[in-house]
């Protein structure tokens, strides 16, 4: 297959088709919600009101086909930490303190060494985030997974204190970007297609297996109003989820330099600019909305919030 104009859809992941499917089932999901559900499908975490005040925040995630790179490199500990960090970041956008985490591990035949590495990574990441690895499910499914293959998913619950809700974003606020280590856990189907047949050099392996950073500690120190975890769909697909209706974002591409791995993916795969920005985090793992006067020294301002004047919620300049 020619690599001319590689895209995420051509690599087997059609985000637009997923979004259409999700829209169709949203009424079924909403039909299960009572008055306790403060946030449902859409934000990065669901919120469930507690009788005494405050909310539980919950999220579920996977690590995608980064697992294939882990299998090729033998580095499974990173994957274990990645799934925890991904989940923690999602509920951190709701100002939640992680309480407990559960995992689901499925494989064709259990490899104790691989399983041990995954649990080591999860345990370390849970300790760093201050949450309990409460339990999980381990499933051997021969005939469903090929020998050596596996999948991993995570589920997290956190607590949003009664006084933790934040002021809503408004026009004039600024966007602060928190740097990523690389792809984190998204875009790997496209990246793997780009590097298909290429030797995994130590440098390339390290870049592709860079850990999904956890932003909890950093976010707890900053005065933000809203936060967007930049995962599947990139900045255009995630930043609008942090903005109220009627607001949009202007993002300045020259405010930071994406990690070298993104330039390599673009070059090798002849991937278009729109495809790159709509698939990968491009060097920012989290974007915070802050009041301009509250921005501390040393952070990277990458854009601003404006009144929405057209169909686009995110404009790049």
Where are these regions (language model features)?
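Glycine-/charge-enriched secondary-structure boundary and capping motifs
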Residues: 2-12, 114-132, 145-150, 197-208, ...
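N-terminal amphipathic/basic leader segments beginning at the initiator methionine
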Residues: 2-35
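Glycine-rich phosphate/pyrophosphate-binding loop regions near the starts of catalytic domains
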Residues: 27-181, 291
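Short, acidic Gly/Pro/Ser/Thr-rich loop/turn segments
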Residues: 63-66, 161-164, 183-185, 233-237, ...
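A structural signal for small-residue-enriched, beta-sheet-centric alpha/beta enzyme cores
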Residues: 175-183, 227-232
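Flexible glycine-rich active-site/ligand-binding loops centered on an Asp-His dyad
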Residues: 183, 191, 304-308
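Short, compositionally biased
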Residues: 188-198
């Amino acid at each position: 297959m020619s690599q001319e104009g590689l895209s995420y859809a051509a690599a087997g992941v059609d985000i637009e088709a997923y979004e259409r499917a999700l829209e169709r089932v949203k009424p079924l999901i909403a039909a299960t919600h009572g008055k306790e559900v403060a946030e449902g499908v859409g934000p990065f975490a669901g919120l469930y009101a507690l009788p005494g005040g405050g909310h539980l925040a919950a999220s579920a995630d996977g690590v995608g086909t980064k697992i294939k790179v882990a299998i090729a490199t033998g580095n499974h500990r990173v994957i274990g930490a990645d799934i925890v960090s991904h989940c923690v970041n999602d509920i951190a956008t709701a100002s939640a303190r992680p309480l407990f985490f559960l995992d689901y591990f499925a494989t064709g035949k259990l490899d104790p060494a691989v399983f041990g590495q995954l649990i080591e990574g999860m345990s370390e990441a849970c300790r760093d985030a201050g949450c309990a690895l409460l339990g999980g499910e381990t499933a051997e499914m021969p005939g469903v997974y090929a020998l050596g293959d596996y999948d991993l998913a995570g589920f997290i619950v956190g607590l949003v204190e009664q006084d933790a809700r934040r002021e809503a974003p408004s026009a004039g606020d600024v966007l602060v970007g928190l740097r990523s280590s690389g792809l984190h856990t998204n875009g790997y189907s496209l990246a793997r297609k780009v590097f298909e047949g290429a030797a995994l050099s130590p440098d390339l392996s390290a870049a592709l297996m860079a850990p999904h950073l956890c932003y909890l500690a950093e976010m707890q120190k900053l005065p933000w109003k809203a936060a967007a975890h930049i995962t599947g769909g990139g900045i255009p697909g995630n930043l609008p989820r942090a903005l109220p209706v009627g607001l949009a974002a202007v993002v300045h591409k020259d405010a930071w330099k994406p990690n070298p791995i993104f330039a390599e993916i673009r070059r090798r795969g002849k991937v278009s600019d729109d495809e790159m920005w709509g698939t990968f985090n491009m060097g920012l793992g989290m974007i915070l909305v802050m009041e301009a006067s509250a921005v501390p020294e040393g952070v990277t301002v990458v854009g601003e919030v404006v009144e929405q004047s057209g169909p686009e919620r995110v404009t790049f300049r």
